[in-house]
Curated annotation (Swiss-Prot):
TM region positions: none
Keywords: Cytoplasm, Nucleus, Transcription, Transcription regulation
GO molecular function terms listed in the Swiss-Prot or TrEMBL record: GTPase activator activity
GO CC terms of this entry: cytosol; GATOR1 complex; nucleus; vacuolar membrane
Protein name: Nitrogen permease regulator 2 homolog
Keyword hit for Transmembrane helix: no
Domain of life: Eukaryota
Family affiliation: Belongs to the NPR2 family.
Taxonomic lineage of the native organism: Eukaryota, Fungi, Dikarya, Ascomycota, Taphrinomycotina
Location(s), subcellular: Cytoplasm; Nucleus
Organism: Schizosaccharomyces pombe (strain 972 / ATCC 24843) (Fission yeast)
BP term (GO), one: positive regulation of autophagy
Length: 409
């Protein structure tokens, strides 16, 4: 399996989602849930006749100012094609009417936006306001309400323009918030995966970096598998795997398959979409060409012709023999890796399934291990790395265990 540069991190391209409005709500002992202030004006109230109202506060008031049992938890409400994120706070005290103060500073986004990056920010704002109320009665003091309005106005403007905000409330208190993109957890890195660096870590690394990272980095060359890197660096496989997942999370590397001449590849449906991009063509030609004199004659048309000649059932070894003359000036390993990374071609994996086992009792430990993997769920790369054997030897071992069929996916 390959994870492209444009793959699981795509959602960062839309970062940050636009903040449409902010409002501050609280529970009034006489009126119940009310909006104390909002920005822009009329976002959730009818102060301007409802012209700019995104959603009426009455429709969400029970969620924004909930029962005490639901306070101190992040809430998200989706209605009228908008989503509201808040973190209601309940402060218990005999100095308050009804012995409690409940308030919530909420943010509004379009419903389809991924607003996960704002959740930590909303929580922090809520906790800051809670501390300010406990220290200087920042919320319950009616004389300070205008200050809250100016605060939410500045937050709205600064977050949309700069993704961060610093507000000095007085000599001792301030609000400092900043947005950071939230990425999903990276795919689990397997022992047979081959990491390919996309950043020059040697320019970033210093003596304070994690020791395991410093050990494994020199062996990340686009050829070694994760298992092999762990062995060469003399670190545990689990530690090496964690390093690769961290690099993958921060976009420092991508994952590809082990390159072997028995591999099979085929074209994807994405290939025609890339033909009209001249920058892509230049990048491809520069990446897959060797330093030999023959490289001067390499064109993208030649490269694309080679990609088109890949098909189901054709091994890389046989593919090269069919196109001996065309391959002059090209690096086949880089040609395959570029094609898989960019989505031009995909790997056709080979999954062995043991249909009928030979009745033998004197199985070796390696054969017993292999027997447990012949269920059609483990492809050849995994078998070779697990057993530390070549594809040829693994094929011979499978043949010795009984009748097997191979599933190509």
């Amino acid at each position: 399996m390959e994870y492209s540069e444009e793959g699981w991190m795509d959602q960062a391209d839309s970062f940050p989602p636009r903040l449409l409005a902010i409002f501050f709500a609280l529970f009034d002992p006489l009126q119940g849930p009310i909006v104390a202030c909002e920005a822009p004006a009329g976002s959730v109230t009818n102060v301007d006749g409802g012209k700019n109202c995104l959603l009426p506060f009455e429709t969400i008031s029970d969620y924004v100012i909930p029962k005490r049992e639901l306070c101190n938890k992040t809430i998200t409400v989706c209605t009228n094609h908008y989503q509201v994120i808040g973190h209601p706070i309940s402060i218990i005290g005999s100095n308050y009417e009804r012995n409690a103060l409940i308030f919530n500073m909420c943010m509004i986004f379009h419903e389809e936006e991924d607003s996960a990056c704002y959740i930590p920010l909303v929580k922090r704002l809520a906790r800051n306001l809670e501390v300010l109320e406990k220290q200087i009665h920042y919320i319950s003091d009616l004389n300070k309400r205008p200050v809250i309005f100016s605060v939410i106005e500045q937050i709205l403007e600064d977050m949309n323009n700069f993704c961060e905000c610093m507000i000095q409330l007085d000599d001792q208190n301030s609000i400092n918030i900043k947005l950071f993109p939230v990425f999903p957890s990276p795919p689990t890195v397997k022992s047979f995966h081959v990491p390919i660096l996309t950043a020059q870590l040697d320019l970033l690394m210093d003596k304070n970096w994690d020791m395991t990272v410093q050990k494994v980095y020199p062996f990340i060359n686009g050829i070694n598998s994760v298992q092999r890197i762990a062995e060469l660096a003399n670190v545990s496989y689990r530690s090496c795997q964690k390093c690769m997942e961290h690099f993958l999370y921060y976009g420092c590397l991508i994952i590809a398959d082990i390159f072997q001449f028995h591999n099979i590849y085929a074209m994807t449906t994405n290939a025609p979409n890339l033909l009209q991009d001249p920058d892509f063509q230049r990048e491809c030609t520069a990446y897959v060409s060797t330093n030999s004199s023959n490289a001067k004659n390499v064109t993208f048309a030649t490269i694309f012709k080679l990609y088109c000649s890949l098909r189901q059932g054709l091994r890389v070894k046989d593919w090269m023999n069919e196109n001996k003359e065309i391959f002059k000036g090209l690096d086949v390993r880089r040609l395959i890796s570029f094609g898989t990374i960019k989505g031009l071609i995909y790997r056709v994996h080979k999954y062995p399934y043991l249909e009928r086992r030979t009745m033998r009792n004197n199985l070796t430990e390696e054969e017993k291990k292999l027997l447990g993997l012949l269920d059609g769920k483990h492809h050849f790369d995994e078998l070779c790395v697990t057993l530390k054997k070549s594809p040829k030897v693994v094929n011979e071992m499978i043949a010795g265990l009984g009748d097997a069929c191979f599933i190509y996916v």
